[in-house]
Amino acid sequence: MSYDEKHLMEGIYREKSGDKFIYYYFDNNEEVTTKDIERINKLRIPPAWTNVWVARDPNSPIQAIGTDSKGRKQYRYNEIHIQGAEKEKFKRLYDFIKSIPKLEKAMVRDNNFPFYNKNRVISLMLQMVRDYNMRVGKEVYARQNKSYGISSLRKKHVKISPGVITLNFKGKSGQRLNYTIRNDFYIDGIKMLMKLEGDRLFQYISTDEDGNEKIMRVNDRDLNKYIQENMGSEFTIKDFRTFGANLYFIQALLSETRKRTPKNRKTIKKNIANAFKSTARQLKHTGAVSKKSYVMNYTLELYQNNPEFFIEHKNDDPIDFLLRILKSYRKDVLGE
């Protein structure tokens, strides 16, 4: 097995005894408790598997690992983990990534509309969400907590300097956020929006049947409606942040793998920690938040237990590799 001694000591192994298996703890070679035997039996580990390792923690997402008769590494997963919220979120993420080209086609189309057209403003906002991983924000949070996202930004949050625009505002949990924008497309767009009356940044001009014009605000519902019309009814703007977190984590993990081959537990742990730090910087939160709420546990467990897979694909395109992992997740964990 490819795990170092420390990792092995955290688990359970088995030995053949007649026509059955006996399971032992690695750290003391004692037979496992009746409670652990009941859990292991529910995993239905095939008798033909060799090099079997079973998690000692009943809450571990990966409960057992072994090698099948064809030499392939196989897994058994925690049923509670499978049934949790992560199941639906990451099942949807694969389809979300596959649907991004449809959204991008719509945004290219709408970028050609007159500037203050509603869809053109929404297109600009979604491109910023994609590139800067901004939260959507809600007007109610802006009023109650003075916390903002892209749909609730005020003009007071914008600072225009030669060749650069800075957005500075309080985000979720009171965190101070600062975005430095040097892209001419975004700079030109924000400058145009600053010319409209009102304190809100993202607004558009609506014209009624009599030709009367009115300045309207773009809200989070408008953004979600645009996404659902152009990508699919199951998606929301929050999927962008899930996508961004997992893509950045994959990019960072592959980069760390190229720097340091994960051949032992210490290197694996360091590479994962650095990848979480890098992801947190991109999303402007902490590594703990990335791990708890955004990054797929399946990727983490896969890197810990099968680093050879990442070594083999360390030069892959990150999006293609993320799709490969998501496809594997849907097959291995969700049984699709």
From Swiss-Prot:
Mutagenesis / variant outcome for changing H285A: Partial loss of supercoil relaxation activity in vitro
EC number(s) per entry: 5.6.2.1
Keyword Repeat: no
Keywords: DNA-binding, Isomerase, Topoisomerase, Virion
InterPro entries for the chain: DNA_brk_join_enz, DNA_topo_I_N_sf, Top1B_N_bact, TopoI, TopoI_cat_a-hlx-sub_euk, TopoI_cat_euk
Catalysis: reaction(s): ATP-independent breakage of single-stranded DNA, followed by passage and rejoining
GO CC terms of this entry: virion component
Signal sequence bounds: none
PROSITE patterns: TOPO_IB_2
Superkingdom of this protein's organism: Viruses
All copies of domain Topo IB-type catalytic, residue ranges: 79-336
GO process terms (BP): DNA topological change
UniProt xrefs under CDD domains: Topo_IB_C
Documented effect of changing R135A: Complete loss of supercoil relaxation activity in vitro
Gene3D superfamilies: DNA topoisomerase I domain, Topoisomerase I, Chain A, domain 3
Active site, UniProt feature: Y294
Protein family membership: Belongs to the type IB topoisomerase family.
UniProt function note: Releases the supercoiling and torsional tension of DNA introduced during the DNA replication and transcription by transiently cleaving and rejoining one strand of the DNA duplex. Introduces a single-strand break via transesterification at a target site in duplex DNA. The scissile phosphodiester is attacked by the catalytic tyrosine of the enzyme, resulting in the formation of a DNA-(3'-phosphotyrosyl)-enzyme intermediate and the expulsion of a 5'-OH DNA strand. The free DNA strand then undergoes passage around the unbroken strand thus removing DNA supercoils.
Name listed for the protein in its UniProt record: DNA topoisomerase 1B
Taxonomy of the source species: Viruses, Varidnaviria, Bamfordvirae, Nucleocytoviricota, Megaviricetes
Gene: TOP1E
